[in-house]
Amino acid sequence: MDKLADLNYTLSVITLMNDTLHSIIQDPGMAYFTYIASVLTVLFTLHKASIPTMKIALKTSKCSYKVIKYCIVTIINTLLRLAGYKEQVTTKDEIEQQMDRIVKEMRRQLEMIDKLTTREIEQVELLKSIHDNLITRSVDVIDMSKEFNQKNIKTLDEWESGRNPYEPSEVTASM
């Protein structure tokens, strides 16, 4: 286990792989050498990272199937990202979690729509009652005794000087 996580051991294996590749491929003009070396380096790094992680996870976890499935899905997603794909591989558990989240969000939106619909119905009923109260009813005789502007009306006899103060008078101006 110590040998798997040792940095010097990892670097020596990478150096050994590079030396082996250089000795196999003597042609300096080979165009695909860098790509082959990159892929082999990535595969080796995945191997070095996944094996100890999986061993530790299997020892500490009670459900080894889920751990192995999760590790394999993670490795496949990493390889897909390295290849340039945007898609990801998902497990059924992740799909079920996403579906539960979507269903929960749909329920929340339906409850909100129901609340809004109830409020709109209440507003329409309120507007109808306001409209019913505002409808003018025809009255034969209008009682003016309660009107604001009719309380202080004085007749011509009740005025002090006997003339209407609101009536315009003639004004002469000197020139």
From Swiss-Prot:
Keyword Transferase: no
Pfam family, one: Rota_NSP4
Binding residues annotated for Ca(2+), in chain numbering: E120, Q123
Gene3D superfamilies, sorted: 1.20.5.430
Primary location class: host cell
Disulphide-bonded residues: none
Glycosites: N8, N18
SUPFAM superfamilies: Rotavirus nonstructural proteins
UniProt record, GO biological process: monoatomic ion transmembrane transport; symbiont-mediated activation of host autophagy; viral process
Cellular component, GO, one term: extracellular region
Cellular localisation: Host rough endoplasmic reticulum membrane; Host membrane, Host caveola; Secreted
Recorded domain comment: Binds 1 calcium ion per tetramer.
Full protein name: Non-structural glycoprotein 4
Source organism: Rotavirus A (strain RVA/Human/Japan/KU/1995/G1P1A[8]) (RV-A)
